[in-house]
């Protein structure tokens, strides 16, 4: 039997100075850019890792970690297999939520909104920036499908390596590309002492402008 774990002992205290409204940028994308830059330059591993939550048409949720591969005023971009579970869910229910947690900085960002595919040109540009092995992997894996053994992937990789051996530039697989989460709400969370954290939520208005509110922790 596994040793019993006392969950009440799994606790840490937050010690940051917190956030003030006057310090927050009126544009949440600019505020995110500041926080993301801090996370990257702090040397945090996988500073662009984020949890992506999707749901089926009937509302059954699922979540997984993906990598943020770009952001601008249009939204937040990640790439994947369109035929994967998340791809099928996004096709049926094109809304998603993202959560990024930088534990050493005691910061979290939550993003929610509708989802759209990136252009084929954007997908090609990113695909061709990837290492060749990763490009081959996109051709090899039928993501989320059941397979009998690892050797099936290894055999498929050998097959694709041979198939594309004479091609310096690999084609973009038709089933692979990017998604953009177009934000409707973005929340910035900063840990504080006594669990009285600072939370600021930006909500996009109909005219495209952002409204910012402080939320209770």
Q: In which residue ranges do the predicted regions lie?
A:
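Binding-site signature for planar aromatic cofactors or substrates
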Residues: 1-217
């Amino acid at each position: 039997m596994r040793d019993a774990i006392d969950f009440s002992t799994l606790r840490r205290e937050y010690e940051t100075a917190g956030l003030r409204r006057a310090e927050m940028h009126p544009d949440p994308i600019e505020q995110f850019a500041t926080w993301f830059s801090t996370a990257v330059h702090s040397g945090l591993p996988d500073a662009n890792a984020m949890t992506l939550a999707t749901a089926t048409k009937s509302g059954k949720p699922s979540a997984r970690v993906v990598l943020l591969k770009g952001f601008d005023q249009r939204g937040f971009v990640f790439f994947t297999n369109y035929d994967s579970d998340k791809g099928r869910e996004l096709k049926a229910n094109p809304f998603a939520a993202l959560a990024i947690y930088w534990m050493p900085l005691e910061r979290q960002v939550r993003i929610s909104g509708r989802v759209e595919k990136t252009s084929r040109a954007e997908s090609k540009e990113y695909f061709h920036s990837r290492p060749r092995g990763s490009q081959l992997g996109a051709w090899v894996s039928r993501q989320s499908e059941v397979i009998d053994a690892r050797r099936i992937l290894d055999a498929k990789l050998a097959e694709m390596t041979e198939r594309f051996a004479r091609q310096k530039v690999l084609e973009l697989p038709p089933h692979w590309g990017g998604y953009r989460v177009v934000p409707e709400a973005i929340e910035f969370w900063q840990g504080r002492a006594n669990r009285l954290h600072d939370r600021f939520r930006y909500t996009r208005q109909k005219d495209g402008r952002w409204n910012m509110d402080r939320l209770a922790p």
